[in-house]
């Protein structure tokens, strides 16, 4: 939730949460990701959006609901370093692939890759780019017209989110 960072009960089934956990456990992530953004739509904002739509009559009965205020991976990286002393190293595909190959050969530690294992190609490169472009311009124009505005995913939200992960012991991010 945007209000307090509380996340879904079955967090272990959430792909984004598992990716974050794997990258923290590995201590590295793909360098190219710093140039990208992530879509996060907190459930309480989505619920507010749905209620707002239901309060107004519209000839349109299909909307594409997601927060168009994307989270910069660079901001996420900076917050993890600054607020939680998490040292994540941005690595080239080649170095990260080499590191992942080594982890996969270690029976005790290979489980830390569970959050990213399905994102690997045959060469052990992580693939997080897509040619699919989301477009909710019509929906967002309508939402603006009826007075609903998506909130930005900012540093405060990331801190709440990560503190919740820490509280439920999903991720160990204690400062040492």
Task: State each model region's role.
Residues 133-176:
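Amphipathic terminal alpha-helices
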Residues 49-123, 165-168, 172-176:
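Mid/C-terminal beta-alpha module of Rossmann-like enzyme folds, strongest
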Residues 120-129, 134, 139:
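A conserved mid-domain beta-alpha-beta active-site/ligand-binding segment of alpha/beta enzyme cores
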Residues 1, 28-39, 58-66, 122-124, ...:
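Glycine- and acidic
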Residues 38-46:
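A conserved structural motif in NAD(P)-dependent oxidoreductases
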Residues 40, 70, 133:
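Short aromatic/basic micro-patch
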Residues 1-37, 71-72:
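Flexible, glycine-rich beta-alpha linker
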């Amino acid at each position: 939730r945007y209000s307090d960072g509380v996340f879904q009960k079955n967090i272990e089934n959430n792909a984004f949460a598992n990716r974050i956990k794997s990258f923290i456990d590995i201590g590295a992530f793909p360098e190219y990701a710093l140039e990208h953004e992530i879509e996060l739509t907190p459930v309480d904002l989505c619920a507010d959006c749905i209620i707002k739509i239901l309060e107004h009559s519209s000839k349109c009965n299909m909307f594409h609901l997601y927060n168009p205020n994307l989270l910069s991976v660079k901001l996420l990286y900076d917050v993890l370093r600054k607020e939680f002393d998490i040292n994540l190293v941005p690595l080239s595909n080649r170095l990260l692939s080499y590191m992942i190959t080594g982890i996969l050969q270690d029976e005790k530690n290979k489980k830390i890759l569970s959050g990213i294992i399905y994102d690997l190609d045959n060469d052990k490169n992580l693939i997080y780019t897509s040619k699919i472009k989301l477009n909710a311009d019509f929906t967002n124009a309508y939402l603006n017209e009826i007075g609903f505005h998506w909130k930005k995913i900012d540093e405060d939200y990331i801190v709440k989110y990560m503190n919740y992960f820490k509280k439920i012991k999903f991720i160990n991010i204690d400062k040492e």
